Every structure is written in C-alpha cells, then in structure tokens.
C-alpha cells in the first residue's frame, strides 16, 4: 500500500514536471520516464562461469571502434576470430542499460540513473590538461587508491550496477561502458541527447590519478575555477557541468551532505538553476558540514559551491540564463558533457563519427 502510494506520488510529480521537460526539443518521450518504489540496495555478484563457446582472449582497439579477439570453442588451438562492434552493437549495450534502469528500482528515489551520471562524471573529471593524465580513458576507479578517494564514495553502487552489463557484453571496455552509461542515464531521465563514441582503453592500477582532482563541495568560486580550469573549461562550461546537480541527492555516509537539490531528482530539468535564482537559501542548522536549505520547504539542499554560482558575477549570468531558458541549458550541457567524457582519450575516430542512441520506448 505504501509502495503504491509512493509510486502514485512520483507519477504525479513527473506529470507536473512534464511540460517543462518536454518543452525542449531535446526532451525524452513521456513513456521513457519510469520510476518505481524504492527498496533496499543489494548488489549482484558477477558470474564466475566460463563459456565453452566464447572465450575472450584480449582487446585491441582499431579505428573509432574496438577490434576484439576471442577464441571459438574455448580449446587450445581453436580458431581466433575478430569482432569489430558497430553502432548497432553499442545500441544493444545502451538498451541493456536502459532496461536495467527501468527494472532495478532499489536505489534513491527509484532510479540508479543519477549515480551512473556521477560515475561517468567522476571517471572523466580527473583529467589534467597540463600533464595529459587522468580522464575517462582507463577506468582506473576500479582500483584502490582511486576507488577510495573521498569524492568517489558511493560509486561502487554504480560500478556494481554495470557488472551484469559488462558480463553480457565482455567486448566493451569499462572506460567505454561507464561513459556510455552516463549518456544513457541522462537521456533516459529526460535530458538532452548525448552524442558518444567508443575508443577508450582500460588501464591497470599504475594509471590511478592522485586524490584532489575532483571538486570539493565545501569550497568557493576560486576552487571551482581551479578544478575545472585544470581540465580546460571556461566559466560558461563550468556552470553547465555543475548543472548535473539536476539529478540525484547527497548522502551523509558519502560526502557528508544530505538531501536532494530539487524536487525531481530523477528527472533532468533546469530546476536546479531556477531554484538557485528564485529561492532564498539559508545555512542549515545541523550536526554536519556547512550546507544550505531552501527557506520555503526546508527539504532541499545546496552545496557552498552551488551558492558560489550565484554569488560570483561571472558565473551568475550563466545561471540566470539557464534558469530562464531550458533549451539553452540542454544544448550547452550536452556539448560540454560530451567534451568532459572525451578529455584525454586518444580517439582514432572523428567527432562526426559520434553516435546518438535511440531512447527506450
């Protein structure tokens, strides 16, 4: 009964938000927004079974897509075949992620989508333009110490969520899988199209990046410019990327912060920016790090770095523009998120070769 009530409540919320979401030319069809009742999280164990028809032996990237070698039959002396995935193969991966998002609702607010976006963001946001290190190429968050960095707390949920997908499509690298999953989540939660291309290679533990390359939510605008500037972003791009806070919520057992940024944490909209501009925010009185709560309902939260976006003149003009123009936010977020996912990746393909995946129906 309680589960049905929660589902009805979420359906009503999404219904009320739908005009704003669908007003954009990038918007998701109505049936794509699926939210069910929340249950306790449980991770799935990866299968240890081996196949006697397909034994993967290695990976060699060629061109814009990967050429993947495997043994037919699984026996010594068996013939070696080469599989070069096409757009249709990557669409199948997208479809599998989208289906799992629709069926696995035992996470915050009924969707793993926001944490998949965070995984793609954090896997990519370690890039350093000066040294050419970090970025999505490598998926080194699979290993300690990077997996144990404070900014990556809680991302095991996202990595575990994708393990069954990796098992089903063993030819895709973790680097490509994590970024494709982020693109899929944004599209399936009503956001803009995220053009994507393969070509990332996985690395071992030696490729782990040092701690401190990701944003610290307790800081101010100077920190934002230092972190994002290291990756090569300008003020407009910085504000657009932080717009990923349209999705998800903070957790006391991870970042130390608590609560969602807006009333629709599983629907991608420009509400984050509208609330920054239109709502009054005050420091929350609680036994935790400094964060801000909305004056109206006292159920939402903002980081100090979020409030810095409206306190800094250079940032605020972009916040106000996105708050007024959802289409502009969707378009510019898509462009800069694609840029983020590709930082430091030695592609052999052209930008014209990017795929735009068909959304689920």
From Swiss-Prot:
Major location (coarse): mitochondrion
Pfam families for this protein: peroxidase
Active site per UniProt: 122, 261
Residue numbers binding heme b: 245
Record GO terms (molecular function): cytochrome-c peroxidase activity; heme binding; metal ion binding; peroxidase activity
PROSITE patterns (alphabetical): PEROXIDASE_1 (PS00435), PEROXIDASE_2 (PS00436), PEROXIDASE_4 (PS50873)
Catalysed transformations (reactions): 2 Fe(II)-[cytochrome c] + H2O2 + 2 H(+) = 2 Fe(III)-[cytochrome c] + 2 H2O
UniProt keyword ATP-binding, yes or no: no
Membrane spanning residue stretches: none
Subcellular location: Mitochondrion matrix; Mitochondrion intermembrane space
Transit peptide stretch: 1-41
Oligomeric form and interacting partners: Forms a one-to-one complex with cytochrome c.
Protein name: Cytochrome c peroxidase, mitochondrial
